[in-house]
Amino acid sequence: YMKKERKINKIPVVAISTFGHCGIDWLHSLIDSHKEVLILPRLSFFRKIDSLKKKSFYLENTLKPNTIVNIIRNIDFFNDKTTRISRSSRILQKNQNKLTFIKYINNFLAAEKELVCEKRLFFAIHYAYAKINKINLNNIKVIVAHEHAPWNCYQYVKHFNSKFVFVVRDPRALVAGSLRGSLK
């Protein structure tokens, strides 16, 4: 008897973020090897969505899965030689097939039509990552999203009703720097 695989969109999402350079990559490294946590290399999902919008690619709920897949090919998270992202930030490693990853994304998008497009894509990318890395979703208790800056964190509340972990170095310096910056 095989237990049915847990639906990824039923797993709670927690976002980690930071105000300034406070060690979020260090926090990420502490979490990423935990067997009950699904965390991608530093994706900053909603920042990527914003960059798509700046290129005039808009994710609509009416888009077909193939169209969404063609749009996300414009996100620079694959291990192409043309992009200048660090090895630790790549979702796919050298031995992993980009077409297989895209197939998993497409399969998820085709199966889960009820979710809002950004939410569908978020879960589709995480689902594909879990599949390509042979991660059993039944063992995952939380999805941790790495958002490098806090500007898009409201999206996690909007789409996932998320909890947050913010890394702040010195709150007094943070407030003083923010006030100084806003007064200029």
Identify what each model region corresponds to.
Residues V14-S17:
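Short hydrophobic/aromatic beta-strand immediately N-terminal to the Walker A/P-loop
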Residues M2-R6:
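Pre-Walker A adenine-sensing motif
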Residues I24-V37:
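A conserved segment at the C-terminal end of the G1
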Residues A110, A130-K184:
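PAPS-dependent sulfotransferase catalytic domain
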Residues L43-V144:
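PAPS-dependent sulfation machinery
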